[in-house]
Regions:
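Catalytic cores and adjacent flexible loops of soluble metabolic enzymes
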Residues: 1-206
Length: 206
């Protein structure tokens, strides 16, 4: 949930697309209602404190923190992190290169946290993934093309008997022209990814 003016200049070459892609309060409420009807949990990244207050009114169960927020790139990064921390709810955090995990842990000292390995390239070249580092995290923010990296991460973590594994993947509708469309998978690929993960979950590695 973000406001285009907070994150981008109006001179950005994709400004019109970015502006149309804002997740407003009204849109968030609609998605929450649809998610509830499907029995799915709704949560999201939010980039300004008022957004946290609104999501609290929707009774979300957890929050996501984007890597750019951890890097304090945006006008309200610190205030937004503090607002999320004050809810006491679980937090999922994408740790981009340069993020201080100790600093973020201090902010969320009273929250249950899940840290995700993340390289903020769009798309991310598969060969840039440092698997030794990635497997130190319980989550993976996957910006590669396709679903191979997510499947590998899940398999490796399952082999290590990890009790909690989180995968983040950008998903788009067919012919979507959103700002992250070029690095997102379509619904059929999401279904394929979930199917692979469910098989891995049932696997025995000991």
């Amino acid at each position: 949930m973000w406001r285009a003016n907070d994150l981008y200049s109006t001179t950005h070459p994709q400004w019109n697309v970015i502006k149309k892609s804002e997740l407003t309060f009204e849109k968030a409420a609609q998605i929450k209602k649809i998610s509830d009807g499907l029995g799915m949990e709704f949560f999201c990244s939010v980039f300004y404190p008022e957004g946290v207050e609104f999501l609290e009114s929707l009774k979300v169960k957890r929050y996501k923190v984007a890597s750019r927020t951890c890097l304090f790139k945006d006008p309200y990064s610190f205030e937004t992190l503090e607002a999320k921390a004050k809810t006491g709810k679980p937090i999922i955090i994408s740790m981009g290169i340069g993020c201080s995990q100790e600093k973020i842990k201090k902010i969320f000292s009273r929250n249950r946290t899940t840290f995700c390995y993340c390289i903020s390239d769009y798309p991310l070249n598969f060969n840039k993934i440092n698997w030794k580092q990635a497997l130190k995290f319980n989550g993976f923010s996957d910006h590669t093309l396709g679903i191979t990296a997510s499947i590998l991460f899940t398999s490796f973590k399952k082999q290590k008997n990890s009790s909690s594994i989180f995968i983040e993947k950008h998903v788009k509708l067919t012919n979507s022209k959103g700002p992250d469309a070029s690095t997102s998978i379509e619904i059929n690929k999401l279904k394929e990814l979930v199917s692979h993960i469910r098989i891995i979950e049932k696997g025995r590695f000991t």
